[in-house]
Regions:
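Asp-based phosphoryl-transfer active-site loop
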Residues: 2-19
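Substrate-recognition element of Asp-dependent hydrolases with the DxDx(T/V) motif
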Residues: 30-52, 67, 102-109
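Catalytic-core regions built around general acid/base machinery
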Residues: 24-37, 90, 94
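Charged helix-capping and loop-helix junction motifs
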Residues: 22-25, 84-85
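Structural recognition of alpha->loop->beta junctions
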Residues: 56-74
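HAD-like small-molecule phosphatases
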Residues: 69-123
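Glycine-rich loop at the start of a catalytic domain that most often binds anionic cofactors/ligands
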Residues: 52-60, 116-120
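A general structural motif
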Residues: 1-3, 37, 99
């Protein structure tokens, strides 16, 4: 059989809603794909550090995260690019000026910086 490559989103695809809980049927399907020698990976807009938590829990070693800006293969980060700082600052200024809640992750950590005390309740 020819090796196939399967990429799965987390939120609402592998997991139930925005949780990190995966149905047993999805876990079984992933196990069968891996046993058959196929490549499995997570592809998500989530921060790599957040995706890695899910990946570790469910046996993924390959991750495309940060909306495609980072690539992890066999558990090693091969590529990670951040958005240009000046553009991010301009965008945050625009969000503030328009009263739109925002949060940023300046590092690859499950930590956000925000000026909005209610941000987590909005997410």
């Amino acid at each position: 059989m020819r090796k196939k490559y399967f990429f799965f989103d987390i939120d609402g695809t592998l997991s139930t809603g925005l949780t990190t809980t995966m149905p047993e049927s999805a876990v079984k399907c992933l196990d069968l794909l891996r046993q058959a020698g196929h490549f499995t990976a997570i592809a998500t807009g989530r921060l790599q550090a957040s995706a890695k938590t899910v990946a570790d829990r469910y046996g993924f070693t390959n991750i495309v995260a940060d909306g495609g800006w980072s690539v992890t293969i066999d558990g090693k980060i091969l590529e990670m690019q951040s958005l240009p700082a000046a553009e991010c600052i301009r965008f945050v200024d625009w969000l503030r000026g328009n009263g739109i809640p925002w949060a940023i992750s300046p590092e690859n950590e499950k930590l956000c910086v925000t000026s909005d005390r209610n941000y987590l309740s909005l997410a």
